[in-house]
Design a protein with these regions (language model features):
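PLD/PLD-like phosphodiesterase catalytic module centered on the HKD motif
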Residues: 1-16, 22-145
C-alpha cells in the first residue's frame, strides 16, 4: 500500500506532522486507510498537522476525499503557503517526531528515511525558517455573505 510509509512515520509520542510539497499530486492522501489513521491520530490530545503547498486548488482536485475530510479537522490541520511562492530545494517531505521522510522521486515512491538526530535537527531548523515565510492558506470553510 502506498500509504504505509506515511502512516508508519508516526511514532507514538509525535504530536506534530509537517507535510511539504508543491501540490501533493503524488501523495496517497485520498486513500481511506490513511485518512482513518490520520483521524485516529488527530483524536488524541495536542495533535496537529501542518500542510505547506504552493497550489491547494490542485491538491483539492487531486484528492477530493482528503479535501472533504479535512473540513472536519480544520481545527487541527493548518494549511500554509510560502509568501514568495517557492519551496526550498530538498524540503519535499513529511516530518513526524524524530523521523523525516524526504521524497526523492514521487512517481516511483523513492524516499529517504532520516533518523539521524543531527540530520533531523538540521532539516527541522530549515523547516522552521521556511515556515516563518509562510502564511495561512486554503481555509477549511468559506464564509459567504
Amino acid at each position: 500500500m502506498a500509504a504505509d510509509p506515511v502512516t508508519s512515520a508516526q511514532p507514538a509520542p509525535t504530536t506534530d506532522l509537517l507535510l511539504i510539497d508543491r501540490d501533493f499530486a503524488a501523495w496517497p492522501l485520498d486513500e481511506s486507510p490513511l485518512l482513518q489513521a490520520l483521524a485516529d491520530w488527530l483524536r488524541l490530545p495536542g495533535r496537529r498537522v501542518r500542510i505547506v503547498a504552493l497550489d491547494f486548488d490542485a491538491l483539492a482536485r487531486s484528492h477530493p476525499r482528503f479535501a472533504r475530510w479535512r473540513r472536519d479537522w480544520g481545527h487541527r490541520i493548518e494549511a500554509l503557503c510560502p509568501v514568495d511562492g517557492a519551496l526550498p530545494p530538498g524540503l519535499r517531505l513529511l516530518a513526524a517526531g524524530p523521523v523525516v521522510l524526504q521524497w526523492l522521486d514521487a512517481p516511483d515512491w523513492r524516499l529517504r528515511r532520516i533518523t539521524d538526530v543531527v540530520h533531523v535537527r538540521s532539516l527541522r531548523e530549515q523547516c522552521a525558517d521556511f515556515l516563518q515565510r509562510c502564511e495561512p492558506a486554503w481555509p477549511a470553510t468559506t464564509l459567504g455573505l
